[in-house]
């Protein structure tokens, strides 16, 4: 898989209509009957970055595992990213957070485009997912306060149907606990679900090797 060919294919995929909600629902069918009232909820704005880079003659991207803490996304697998700060664009947020969390030099990051926004009800965030690339393999440096570990994923693994699995998950909410059968992506033996999985599924659909 030639790196430049993949990057070109990603650029070309952004010239077509995004798969959007249809791709999201494949990995989050429980969202189908949920109507999100953004005006009423006034969500916080966040950005993430799916960052492609060359490694060992292959194409990789990285995910991170959040540390354990008293919060909604404790121990979850996600992209580098975070809350939009006053005075910066959502694209700048994605680049800044990637630098702060995994140490990638902002100057080296090339943004290709933005995928479909994803609303996350438990934390009331509206996520703007960006795709970007590096010319060279990065030397990561994780911020231990925000990143438990960095997970490097070969892009070829993303396009195997065998990675789509499901498991029962129990959720704790103010209205009470409930259990759902939740689809997830099995990447590097990690359970990748929720907003991260729906963003990745849209990316899968955009490329479809």
Question: What annotation goes with each model-predicted range?
Answer:
Residues 1-2, 20, 140-143, 160:
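Alpha-helix initiation/capping motif
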Residues 142-182, 186-188:
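NUDIX/MutT-family hydrolases
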């Amino acid at each position: 898989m030639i790196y430049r060919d993949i990057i070109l294919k990603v650029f070309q995929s952004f010239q077509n209509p995004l798969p959007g909600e249809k791709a999201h629902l494949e990995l989050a069918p429980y969202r189908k009957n949920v109507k999100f009232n953004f005006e009423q909820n006034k969500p916080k704005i966040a950005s993430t970055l799916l960052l492609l880079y060359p490694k060992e003659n292959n194409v990789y991207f990285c995910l991170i595992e959040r540390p354990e803490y008293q919060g909604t996304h404790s121990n979850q697998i996600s992209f580098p990213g975070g809350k939009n700060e006053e005075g910066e664009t959502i694209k700048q947020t994605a680049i800044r957070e990637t630098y702060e969390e995994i140490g990638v030099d902002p100057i080296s990051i090339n943004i290709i485009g933005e995928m479909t926004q994803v609303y996350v009800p438990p934390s009331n965030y509206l996520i703007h997912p960006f795709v970007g690339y590096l010319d060279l393999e990065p030397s990561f440096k994780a911020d231990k306060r925000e990143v438990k570990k960095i997970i490097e994923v070969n892009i070829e693994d993303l396009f195997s149907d065998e990675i789509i699995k499901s498991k029962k998950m129990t959720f704790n909410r103010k209205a009470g606990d409930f259990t759902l059968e939740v689809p997830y992506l099995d990447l590097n033996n990690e359970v990748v679900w929720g907003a991260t999985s729906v963003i990745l599924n849209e990316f899968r659909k955009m490329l479809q090797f």
